[in-house]
Amino acid sequence: MENDQFMCPTDIITGIVFIDGELAMLTLTADGELRWTEYGLRQYLSMKKDVLGFIVEGKQIRVKAVVEKEAGGICCGQFGGDFVRKDFVFEPLIDQNGWCYKLRQYLDSLGRPKRLLVFVNPFGGKKSAREIFVKEVKPLFEDADVQLEIQETKYQLHAKEFVKSMDVSKYDGIVCVSGDGILVEVVNGLLERADWRNALKLPIGMVPAGTGNGMIKSLLDTVGLRCCANSATISIIRGHKRSVDVATIAQGNTKFFSVLMLAWGLIADIDIESEKFRWMGSARIDFYALQRIICLRRYNGRILFLPAPGFEGYGQPASCSLYQEPHVSDKEVGYQGPETKFEDLEWREMKGPFVTIWLHNVPWGSENTLTAPAAKFSDGYLDLIVLKNCPKLVLLSLMRQTSSGTHVESPYIVYIKVKAFVLEPGALVDEPDKEGIIDSDGEVLARGKRTYKCDQKALMSYDKLQVTVDQGLATLFSPEY
């Protein structure tokens, strides 16, 4: 039989196989494609993009793959939207072991994770994480032959406590089936380890199963994928990685490590006070935002910032002295924040009253909120959004525009990039005996006088705090970009 049209000197393996009871020539090419002809049509599967794994069933080899839901066919080199699982079965006439060896060798060369620690948060959002994991996530990992250690979180900070003491050598990565909260716990736990430098090499993956899902939305949206569990899981299986900036929020000796955002004023009030409507799911945000805009609060205070190049004209010149902790060995106490000296640089300031202050590390704050459209994962800067005053009807329109990111084009919005930031929060303009809430990554960072009381304990006092950023400090599983 003439095989020239299928073979070239760089092919890894080629041979005659049965596919659906018909003889065909199957080739694994050097660039990682399985190619064959079926019913007169040339077909292919990309080992990198389509194939999850394979199993042997008697004389047959069953290749586990994912295909684009809209495509309807086996050819699926380019993805967009949801994926569906699809098997490709063939039976080699000879050398089944050779096929298995070459397939395994190629998959192993891709550097995909083989052992993952998985946190499932059964309490987040609509409490659907367990079901999402069992029905959508676990089957994909099984197809890819990934070994899982599953930990259901039982209380707040459970994930943080676990990663602080775990043996990092046991895993190739960590997966959070939750909203953004478990991701933040994991990052803080890794950074508080004595071996934080080594621990941070462990990539973290997210599967959306909570209320916010801002980080995974930002990652998937970058390459045009929908924010859904199977897209996120497949991105983890493929094993591509990218670095992400980590912000250190400090008040005296107290520190919190943020990968998403810090908010004060309107946005923090909506995020935290809407917890009483958690049963509504993500709709609680829109519902409570309307209430808060109707009864709009304005806060006294001051912000100072170190602008990125090109943003030096915003605000007024100011001097700023950041708190510097006495030098101690980070081998004993964990990560202490970036070591950059900021005091002699050209700081700027803005004074209140403010409606809201929003500091963002990635583009999306949630699945429906494109807070900072110009934000980058590892540029070493945070995106600062300032709203000082705004008519209520205009503000309602701006809140709707956050779904597309066009709110930052408003003349009422100041949108800049900063390297460091200081917040000096004050009381409400109309109620001087009432203060506000400072929110970071969806958690209460500080709570002032006469504010909404919730189950979350504040880490810091309602006072001056500083934010610095360390470029590309943490590692995330990511779609290929």
From Swiss-Prot:
Annotated substrate binding sites = S178, G179, D180, G181, D271
Q: How does it sit in the membrane?
A: Peripheral membrane protein
Active site (UniProt): D180 (proton donor/acceptor)
Which Gene3D superfamilies does the entry mention?
2.60.200.40, Probable inorganic polyphosphate/atp-NAD kinase, domain 1 (3.40.50.10330)
What's the top EC group for this one?
transferase
Q: What is its EC number?
A: 2.7.1.91
Positions of ATP binding: N121, P122, F123, T153, E185, G210, T211, G212, R278, R284, D441, G442, E443
* Identification of the protein by name: Sphingosine kinase 2
Q: Which organism is it from?
A: Arabidopsis thaliana (Mouse-ear cress)
Please name the taxonomic classification of the source: Eukaryota, Viridiplantae, Streptophyta, Embryophyta, Tracheophyta
| Gene from which the chain derives | SPHK2
